[in-house]
Amino acid sequence: MISGSSERHIIDLSQGDYEGLDQYNAAKPFCKKAYRVDRAEDMGLAVARAIRTAVSGRPGGVYLDIPADTIVQEDTADQSNFGVYKLVDPAPKQVPNDEAISRAVDLIKNAQKPLIILGKGAAYDQTEKQVQQLVAETNIPFLPMSMAKGLIPDDSPHSAAAARSLSLRNADVVIVIGARLNWMLSYGDAPQFNPHAKFV
């Protein structure tokens, strides 16, 4: 979110300008990160930093505050061009080590009743082809969370959506792709899940 605000000296001294809420500090508790731009030449860096923060790690909202005295600053064309940043790999991938991959493969190979849970992270990352291939090659049933519906067609013979509770209770290995074990999935705990289930 990009927003204008009152001039810095008015905000900092709490002088009570018209609609002069300290938006930067007000936004901090409600977003992943808040930034304030104090100089026009820093605008490009601030926008690049905000985008990288928003999409890196766990995605989240970022607030970018541009005070009125920054908005009216003048800049030369050279300064403006210098402040433009090209985002290179805004969300670097996190790659697990070989040992972790090997353990996961062994768990999945030895599973009697594996289950794949697809979450919104899989949808955001546009993994349709990869998850469809995974399900087709392994014949592991899948359960899409609401924001992941459509990654694999609902009429797939591998869909466990119609037997959600039974699938969760019986699965001995649960492969979680792009989802979090939060309240919607009972934090991965029994009785909704098999108490001996292993999670990948």
Summary of predicted features, one role per range:
Residues 1-200:
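N-terminal alpha/beta PP-like core and its mobile active-site loop of ThDP/TPP-dependent enzymes
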